[in-house]
């Protein structure tokens, strides 16, 4: 990096014009485009910028605002998880990174165009669809996805009109992962605990009128296979005025298996057994009801029918027995999946992810031939598994692969590439995002919250000055 570049970086002149001067003055030969400004994209950018001196990284994001699931997926009462935004911000302010918000792959720009303009393209646009139960009546108004519910209270543009019906007593959540527990906690938490978070105002208003008293958390398998983690369960058990009720029969013989379990699973199971032993000592006006060994069978107005299952080699096999649960509102939380946004992407529609080997996107599935210069990271490549640390490690690995391919000349970077052409596009730069950030922070401060998110794309663009 040249002296001028270092001076600009040290002075902290992270405006778009300063960044452009740095990029032009050092005349880099390697241009890399990352599509998606979520955790996978930022972690990959962080490592690439560290390992490749002579490169420019452009991050293209379909929304005006960055951070993906950290902004729109992490529960509002988990602000400590959102601290990773500070790390992403440092990466975004690197003088060799440019942010292009409000640019959608497949609509505003094609993959072919990006490949023509960059030496390498890394797809990290995540998983924005949810898996279906595939049951009759699933399209009823009282059946919604946990993903949409999370987007609703987190202010994802387009989710503000979801209007979940919270006028009934009973809610059934199908699935037992951490997202399902987050949703249960949001439904059962005292409103005062949420007022100081960045929960959207319209969600707070709806929750203030909620009549929900009982939340069933239903899973196909048993306690030893529960997908939620100990942190999320502890939070549920500590909720004021909420009585957690386990079914004793679900834990038959479980205590005899404790010594065989790995430490994380053992600690989680011990906490469930402790809670089971103590249940009934504290009475609350609301109830959290985890139910195991039940598979969705049918949906009817006001209720849901489940098949009783039994475990056969860790798999849940339905029996002839059934159970019905009162369900004024049903939330499915059985996994996310990605979508194919451009015809140039080698997409596995069955698995809902991009065909790849260790982050290199395949050109030919049969032979395993990779498509040089085209990569994938995050949930788009792996499927929706793990937590942010999992995504970080995966993104670092793919970023290292990109660097290795460039350094070993497996990827040809000898030709000059122009980078993205933003002329005529309503692009939100990093400066524009900072204006949105300042606006949201000020609006939140006036209400005693960390921020009040803008939920309209047009309003975001207006505040950004686009």
Curated annotation (Swiss-Prot):
Q: What is its main location?
A: mitochondrion
So what EC number does this one have? 1.18.1.6
Task: Tell me where in or outside the cell this protein is found.
Answer: Mitochondrion inner membrane
Q: Name one GO molecular function term.
A: ferredoxin-NADP+ reductase activity
Q: Name one GO biological process term.
A: metamorphosis
The entry marks the following residues as binding FAD, namely 40, 61, 69, 105, 379, 386-388
The yes or no answer to whether the keyword Flavoprotein is present is yes
Expression by tissue: Expressed predominantly in prothoracic gland of the larval ring gland and nurse cells of the adult ovary. Low expression is all adult tissues examined.
Which coenzymes or cofactors are required? Answer: FAD
**Binding, NADP(+):** 176-179, 220-221, 232, 386
Topology relative to the membrane: Peripheral membrane protein
Q: Which GO terms describe its cellular component?
A: mitochondrial inner membrane; mitochondrial matrix; mitochondrion
Keyword Signal in the entry? The reply is no
- Reaction equation(s) it catalyzes: 2 reduced [adrenodoxin] + NADP(+) + H(+) = 2 oxidized [adrenodoxin] + NADPH
Question: Which pathway does this polypeptide act in?
Answer: Steroid metabolism; cholesterol metabolism
| Keywords of this entry | Electron transport, FAD, Flavoprotein, Membrane, Mitochondrion, Mitochondrion inner membrane, NADP, Oxidoreductase, Transit peptide, Transport
Q: Which InterPro entries match?
A: FAD/NAD-bd_sf, Ferredox_Rdtase, Ferredox_Rdtase_adrenod
Its biological purpose is as follows: Required for synthesis of steroid hormones, for olfactory sensory behavior and completion of the second larval molt (a steroid mediated developmental transition) and pupariation.
Task: Spell out the family assignment given in the record's similarity comment.
Answer: Belongs to the ferredoxin--NADP reductase type 1 family.
Q: What is this protein called?
A: NADPH:adrenodoxin oxidoreductase, mitochondrial
The species this protein was found in: Drosophila melanogaster (Fruit fly)
The lineage is: Eukaryota, Metazoa, Ecdysozoa, Arthropoda, Hexapoda
Its gene name is dare
């Amino acid at each position: 990096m040249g002296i001028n570049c270092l001076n600009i970086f040290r002075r902290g002149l992270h405006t778009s014009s300063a960044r452009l001067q740095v990029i032009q003055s050092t005349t880099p030969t390697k241009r890399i485009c990352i599509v998606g400004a979520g955790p996978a994209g930022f972690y990959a950018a962080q490592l690439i910028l560290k390992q490749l001196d002579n490169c420019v990284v452009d991050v293209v994001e379909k929304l005006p605002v960055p951070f993906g699931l950290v902004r729109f997926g992490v529960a509002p009462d988990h602000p400590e998880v959102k601290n990773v935004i500070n790390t992403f911000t440092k990466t975004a302010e690197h003088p060799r990174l440019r942010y292009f918000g409000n640019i959608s792959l497949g609509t505003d720009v094609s993959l072919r165009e990006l490949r023509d303009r960059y030496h390498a393209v890394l797809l990290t646009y995540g998983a924005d669809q949810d898996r279906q139960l595939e049951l009759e009546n699933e399209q009823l108004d009282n059946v919604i996805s946990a993903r949409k519910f999370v987007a609703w209270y987190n202010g994802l543009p387009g989710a503000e009109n979801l209007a979940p019906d919270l006028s009934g007593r009973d809610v059934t959540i199908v699935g037992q992962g951490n997202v399902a527990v987050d949703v249960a906690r949001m439904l059962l938490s005292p409103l005062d605990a949420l007022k100081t978070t960045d929960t959207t105002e319209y969600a707070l208003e709806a929750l203030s009128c909620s009549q929900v008293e009982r939340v069933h958390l239903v899973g196909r398998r048993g306690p030893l296979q529960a997908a939620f983690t100990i942190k999320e369960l502890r939070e549920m058990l500590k909720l004021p005025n909420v009585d957690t009720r386990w079914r004793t029969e679900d834990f038959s013989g479980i205590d005899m298996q404790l010594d065989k379990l790995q430490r994380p699973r053992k600690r989680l199971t011990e906490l469930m057994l402790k809670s089971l032993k103590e249940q009934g000592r504290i009475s609350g006006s609301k109830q959290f009801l985890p139910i195991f060994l039940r598979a969705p069978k049918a949906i009817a107005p006001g209720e849901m029918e489940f098949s009783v299952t039994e475990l056969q080699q860790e798999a849940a096999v339905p029996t002839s027995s059934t159970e019905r649960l009162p369900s004024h509102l049903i939330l499915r939380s059985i996994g996310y999946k990605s979508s194919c946004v451009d015809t140039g992407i080698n997409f596995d529609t069955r698995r809902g992810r991009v065909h790849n080997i260790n982050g290199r996107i395949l050109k030919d599935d049969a032979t395993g031939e990779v498509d040089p210069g085209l990569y994938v990271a995050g949930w788009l490549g792996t499927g929706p598994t793990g937590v942010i640390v999992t995504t970080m490690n995966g993104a670092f690995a793919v970023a290292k692969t990109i660097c290795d391919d460039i350094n070993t000349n497996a990827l040809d970077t000898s030709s000059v590439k122009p980078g993205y052409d933003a002329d005529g596009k309503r692009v939100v730069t990093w400066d524009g995002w900072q204006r949105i950030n300042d606006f949201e922070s000020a609006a939140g401060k006036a209400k005693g919250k960390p921020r009040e998110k803008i939920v309209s794309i047009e309003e975001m663009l207006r505040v950004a000055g686009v």
